[in-house]
């Protein structure tokens, strides 16, 4: 047979074999087109699992009359135009083949109107000859796509479709993933005329909580740990379930790269390694994570359905994700603080900060615990202590796994504690009210609300008070950075930072090297340049390129310096992690302060706490 060019319809049907796997694939492609068009509301109507009808209606920018027919043509798109665009893709779609492929195996109708047009236009195409008919129509600004009789002209493909319930289940999962990617978009999903899912657009944290809970369930919210990390052009945020929650939730894994839903093996491997042996081989972590990468550093044009990407610096991305998840898991314990006298038995001359909430020992100022004695101590106080382990095998460090197994079996009473309140992420109202009282017999009170931008209104008995959150945060950091005799534990940086110093700063770095080591800073001076390799955990999220030169400049002015004075300097020069505070963050901060700094509760310093005078308001009301 001689070589010949395939007819357009046959070529599109071949492409449809990759793009249109099942009705859920059609929904994914069309909804992503709506998101690229700037839609804030998307209505999805399904009949008979998508075999009879798939209708997607949005309020996006729409398609002009002159572009309607071209929109159904193969390799026609408005999203890229040059090779440079292809190498830095920011849209969800870019190949220009989805509509052509779908129309080749269905009867497709596209109705659209732009803001500049006075009337809408409708384009119709079906698989036989790919002819497109355009005619006037009535439609608001936006687009509606109707896909009728999917695979009507490819009986073999239609025969492989599953039951109506199964196909709709796949559609439901696709919509769930898209709803998690775009909290700002309202999405409604109907099946056979019945509204099945309604995801309202989220504008504040309480609405984010409701939407996340409606998709992932309340159990995920209860065990979710907030994660937010940034390094250079890499940013990761979202939620990971603690190991106890991951064991209960089963496989719930949602990952997004630049807002594109993804099933990437590199990302999954990094997260699985972060959990080490805290999960069995047949258990999987649960997470909802959003990774932001420079578009030039990631190639999304490597998979037909765009489910996988290729990172230009894969090892860097892997280590970044691994370190971020590991740090969050180390910061949070498996159980709340015991309501016993254990806290009173701890030494008090130096505030002993901890790098996790409501559990156990001081991981900022204590050295790494000895593995040999771990089994004789409470399991919940040492479960997160081991250093991160790198291993690509299926066992994830077998020796560590044996130790974890012993720890988990050592103290049976730890099991009921897992049901108690943990680090507040999106806690229920009752938990928010009781959390500040759980850590210590001394409490500021109950957080009622946040008075923007940074004040917490607190109820303590019959009195109301305003608490200055940045001041409380500063005192907490001073406690966290005040080392014990062993010094603060250094946390290695993913990428060492190199800084240029003047002579005075370089001399100060050498002169104060013992002090810097005590503070958990690994600084190496070489010919007027310093390489920063490790910092204590409270400094990981800071702008180190700015902070370290300021620190060395300060040390250059002093021949002698104590760790306590330097901890105070750090506390006053560190940037806040919160531009706008919310109730959960305030409760978290107060829990830490009450736990680590009970002196502040007994004798609040100036500028921290201010009683609210209700007498004047009551007097005014009585006079009225």
UniProtKB/Swiss-Prot annotation:
InterPro entries: DNA_mismatch_repair_CS (IPR014762), DNA_mismatch_repair_MutL (IPR020667), DNA_mismatch_S5_2-like (IPR013507), HATPase_C_sf (IPR036890), MutL/Mlh/PMS (IPR002099), MutL/Mlh/Pms-like (IPR038973), MutL_C (IPR014790), MutL_C_dimsub (IPR042120). GO terms for molecular function: ATP binding; ATP hydrolysis activity; ATP-dependent DNA damage sensor activity; mismatched DNA binding. It comes from the Bacteria. CDD domains: HATPase_MutL-MLH-PMS-like, MutL_Trans_MutL. Residues 360-396 are annotated as: Disordered. One of its GO terms (cellular component) is mismatch repair complex. Residues 369-385 have a biased composition (Basic and acidic residues). Gene3D superfamilies: 3.30.230.10, Histidine kinase-like ATPase, C-terminal domain, MutL, C-terminal domain, dimerisation subdomain, MutL, C-terminal domain, regulatory subdomain. The keyword Membrane does not apply. Keywords: DNA damage, DNA repair. GO terms for biological process: mismatch repair. This protein is involved in the repair of mismatches in DNA. It is required for dam-dependent methyl-directed DNA mismatch repair. May act as a 'molecular matchmaker', a protein that promotes the formation of a stable complex between two or more DNA-binding proteins in an ATP-dependent manner without itself being part of a final effector complex. NCBIfam families: mutl, PRK00095.1-1. PANTHER family: DNA MISMATCH REPAIR PROTEIN MLH, PMS, MUTL, DNA MISMATCH REPAIR PROTEIN MLH1. Belongs to the DNA mismatch repair MutL/HexB family. This is DNA mismatch repair protein MutL. The gene is mutL.
